[in-house]
Amino acid sequence: MKKVLVVGSARESFGGVSSTIKLMEQMPVWKEHTCYWLGTQIQRNYLWKLWYAMKSCFMAFFIIWRYDIVHFHTVPDRICLIIQMPIFLLAMLGKKKIIMHIHMGNQLRNHTANKLFLWHLRHADLIVLLAKKWQKLFLESYSNIKTPTTVLYNSCAMTPHSDYANRKNTILMMAYFNDNKAPDLLLKAWQTLQSRYPDWHIYMLGNGEVERFRQMSIDMGLQDSVTFTGYVTGKQKEEYFHNASILCMCSYEEGFPMVVLEAWTYGIPVVTTPVGGLPDVIEEGRNCVTFPFGDADALADKLAALIDNEQQRSDMSAYSQEFVRNHFSPEKINQDLRNIYARF
């Protein structure tokens, strides 16, 4: 069985890439291929990032020779590509099979002139996209790249079923808060709804520009019905998800959003933009409710309709858990990843 070196964000990092690798680490395919996770980027200060990148390159020089496949989890960001490039060159020198697993969606169209990205794509043996939608976009936008492509959806760990009737009147948003994640849309929508639903509360889970959006919520008079918790993990995160009645996502750009998969595993009805790879799997009114990008009024209407219809929320909860189990379970993605490695 060919051995695989997995290169990507550090274990200690936040976000979808490290979450994806952590889930892969729990799959049988990880042991079957004697996989090793080499972290290259970490979310710390610049000196710490530099030291971490240098350490990973130093380690790669000594360990890469024992592996047959190097599986890069990456984005077209110049800094990310530069950090991973020494390891990429070592993989080429050692004649290793190279997989470029691109954690990006509609942003791909912004990188067609990125020479560094194009160079990496041409020298890879396989390009992995997060959804069929992004594979189609890639083939259209990068028609001069002849490297084969395939699709691997993100996986999500299953959680025990919980009775939706026991949920609290809470709405979650979980993100690295910035303009792309658009938490202001949820705040604007809630500003029109809070007086109608005084017994409902919004919890904003995550880091990023927290103080900016917290102040925005105060300026809107939402401080009594909106709470910014900061970044949460473990039991605390589980408690929020087990209790939530709705999860909202307002993003403009995503690859394939992990937070939606997580919500489905907990049986949380999702209200979202049709962002990233979600159009591949959206069943409107069954596993999610969608609203147009940037439209706070439409979001308010969708939230109100869902809050008012407890039966629909209960039905969506049950169906979402069944749906994610059938399409995104670790068992399903484990076999898909096994098939990818078997190509070599």
Describe the role of every protein-language-model region:
Residues A298, A305, Q312-N326, I333-N339:
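A short, well-ordered alpha-helix in the C-terminal region of glycosyltransferases
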Residues Y231-V232, E239-A244:
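Short alpha-helical donor nucleotide-sugar binding micro-motif in glycosyltransferases
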Residues P269-T272:
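Short hydrophobic beta-strand element within catalytic cores of glycosyltransferases
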Residues R122-H161:
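Donor nucleotide-sugar binding/catalytic pocket of nucleotide-sugar-dependent glycosyltransferases
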Residues L5-V6, D163-Q194, Y203-L205:
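Conserved donor-binding/catalytic core segment of Leloir-type glycosyltransferases
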Residues Y252:
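Aromatic "clamp/platform" in nucleotide-sugar-dependent glycosyltransferases that forms part
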Residues R214-V232:
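Nucleotide-activated donor-binding/catalytic signature segment of Leloir-type glycosyltransferases, i.e.
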Residues E284-G285, V289-A296, A305-E310:
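Conserved acidic donor-binding segment of nucleotide-sugar-dependent glycosyltransferases
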